[in-house]
């Protein structure tokens, strides 16, 4: 499940263009109103947010030698709220988190929340004895646990687009930045009716062959 979540975020070019804070702030007019270019322009605040929480928890545990965790931080936040019944400003959560743990976490918050740099997943997971292995896999794979066979065979070529198959061809719905479809100058709403002289009756099958 974790590998699948990491893969979904890494396969989204939007992670390099939209910060986590921006994703959360614009959720109602971008994330919930996606268009044909959304995979290239936005990142899911659900998926990247979950990975950010994981990294923060592991970072706190490592830097505090196990004395604190994200759970203990959230419990203290809840106790604070019970005492005052008041909310907190946007960035006060980060300030309070550092006060509770006694740690300087500014660099992490800046990277995770306000930049488009990738999360330090490998480094954080390593503190818990987990090795993160990156493998070249087709987009349809979805991610998972690596095994001895993962690197034994080259991955199937990735078409680089989503499409809707019809009886007389395949209509592209999304074209991913940097993929084969974009490199071939294909665009959303383009219709493929022929592949190497054969009618495009099953693009997924014909492409894999």
Locate predicted features.
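Beta/coil-rich, acidic/histidine-enriched accessory regions frequently appended to metallopeptidases
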Residues: 84-209
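Active-site-adjacent bridging/hinge elements
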Residues: 17-33
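Zinc-dependent metallopeptidase catalytic helix centered on the HExxH motif
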Residues: 1-14
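Amphipathic alpha-helical substructures
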Residues: 10, 28-132
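Secondary-structure junction/capping motif
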Residues: 19, 69, 178-179
